[in-house]
């Protein structure tokens, strides 16, 4: 016995999410420098930045190169102007934790896979000095967990993410809200920040295409499709089913008729543009 409780395959904890940062820390892209996460060229930061930060009177020990000649001439006393690099690498992340995401036949639930994908991406953004916003959709509501501007503040948010996941895991709601309804909140958040959505694409809703088109006109939007191997390639055989509206029965699936959910999802997004 080691004294450490092992997290089950269908559960998560804060320590597990913290360890995901190691995947980013070991990434060679981080060593290449702190450039934009989506850039193809990387370079280390140099200089003092170009965004004005403040203007103040000269103090002993200040670098003479920071003198602001205009303010000095206008006031008659030496003044220095400080600069910094604008931190505008903000990303808004959406985690689909509706009831259908609590399903899985290999390794873990789709909900856990969605959380893992978003947390890894969020750690990467923070390592590049960006800010991350986390929005979570459940059967009851869609809400903004908050914005994190540092690794410390993001670590505090992980506790709430774990609590929301566990609450949903212990509920047995049968009906998913439409995805387009759950996504409505993100249109009002984050200004022009890119949006990354981890979802199983269940119950998208009739207005989903229109919503995505509207968002894509103003900001970058990326989908991470979370699917289970059983969805992509179920073994041939008879399968019982029971729908939320009370229908039940059996269906026979042939191997060549396997659900190609990834292809359907990709094709639909391409048609949206």
List each language-model region with its residue ranges.
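Exposed, interaction-prone extracellular/peripheral surfaces
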Residues: 2-41, 57-62, 71, 80-85, ...
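N-terminal juxtadomain amphipathic helix
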Residues: 64-66
